[in-house]
Amino acid sequence: MKYTNYDIIRRPVITEKSMGAMNEKKYTFIVDIRANKSMIKRAIEDVFGVTVETVNTSRYKGKKKRVGVHIGKRPDYKKAIVKLTEESKTIEFFEGIQ
């Protein structure tokens, strides 16, 4: 199956820690679990029009949740921390968030 750039990037991560990393031009996203670093780099560069220096990824297991007697599990996910080059502009989506 061929992925589009919008299939690879699921959503941004908006936390206090990720907002602090923005000063170093590091942005955090939840990405498709099957995406590799080169796919993530290409998707970020195409969608936001920036130049990516490095991509660091981490895979997480979904938490087990229980409602009454029923036991379920949240889905597994992958988080990508993308560092932009010094010459690159900032990602406009994050500019208004502080």
Curated annotation (Swiss-Prot):
Cellular component, GO annotation: ribonucleoprotein complex; ribosome
GO molecular function: rRNA binding; structural constituent of ribosome
UniProt key word Ribosomal protein: yes
Keywords in alphabetical order: Ribonucleoprotein, Ribosomal protein, RNA-binding, rRNA-binding
Any one of the GO BP annotations: translation
Function: One of the early assembly proteins it binds 23S rRNA. One of the proteins that surrounds the polypeptide exit tunnel on the outside of the ribosome. Forms the main docking site for trigger factor binding to the ribosome.
Subunit (UniProt): Part of the 50S ribosomal subunit. Contacts protein L29, and trigger factor when it is bound to the ribosome.
Record protein name field: Large ribosomal subunit protein uL23
Annotated organism of origin: Clostridium kluyveri (strain ATCC 8527 / DSM 555 / NBRC 12016 / NCIMB 10680 / K1)
